[in-house]
Amino acid sequence: MQGKKILFISYDGMTDPLGQSQVIPYLSNLTKFGYSFVILSCDKPGSYAANRAYVENMLAPFAIQWVSIPYHKKPPVLSSLYDFYVLKKKAKQLHAIHHFDMVHTRPGLPSLIGIYLKNKFGIKFLNDIRGFWADERVEGEIWNLKNPLLKKIYHFFKAHEKACLAKADYSVCVTYKAKEIIHNRTDLPNQPLPVEVIPCSVDMNLFNPDKVDQLLKAAFSSALNINKDDFIITYLGSLGGWYLTDEMMHFCKAVADKIPKAKFLFIVPDSQSTVAAAAAKYGLADGQVIVQHGKRHEVPVLLSFSNYAVFFIKPCYSKQASSPTKHGEIMSMGIPVITNSG
């Protein structure tokens, strides 16, 4: 595939933290091997307006073109159907221009388009599994199966998951457990299917404690009222879903009761009020909780305040196929991680 053109379709925006931590670093490094990419993503209008220039600067040195369409959240289901229609139409237009050799998607709506492009145009299809997606939606309490429509959608995507595994030219996953689960499925023909494990990786040049911008750190220290003798425990990433917010806040309160100088830094896209409300349930004072959104280059600086980091994940079936990027990023900074068993 060296020297080939690849379409990467993402329902996550490049102007959101996930796109900047899990998509752009991977693809930018692959361009060094002669590949060129077009990223087709759905971006929240507010994030796009605020971060478009930042993302364009990230991509500028590489053979990567970025095409973004607006993400719609409401009304539920219908908004997703509309986004799918626009993504599919745009993917066809881009293929007419670039004549892609391969389409690379993660599960969900993008993989529907990946299968379509393979069937319609004979493009090779790379099925990139970052979690058992339909089950994640249920176990993350996004889809309630008591709702008949959502139950139908769940079963549709479970069938689609099977089709992706069966039809993909290759599948990749991030855990050996996921590969084992896939290869143990008796409802898939031609086992063992072509599956490779590529664990979540980290940019160790960026997440390097020896390369922290000390001027930026001093500015954050002043703005966030972080003192040298504070004991900082950090959470990185979005709250909710599969991450056990209540349990983490309970843990933070237990630490605060034992360590008076403890403060809890949340490097999150969530609002101050959202985090404060979750913390208040467990009696954490406003002065003990720090909330800061960080751009990609700012995250290592914010992490460098940490004595420890914490994240608790719901131990469920779907998460056997996922590997938190944050884990590698935190460890690359030399910060001990407190987490739960699964």
Segments from the language model and where they lie:
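Nucleotide-activated donor-binding/catalytic signature segment of Leloir-type glycosyltransferases, i.e.
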Residues: I267-V268, S273-F305
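N-terminal subdomain of nucleotide-sugar transferases
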Residues: M1-V67, H98, H250-D257
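Nucleotide-sugar-dependent
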Residues: P17, Y243, Q292-L302, N307-M331, ...
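Conserved donor-binding/catalytic core segment of Leloir-type glycosyltransferases
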Residues: L7-I9, N227-Y243, M249-C252, L265
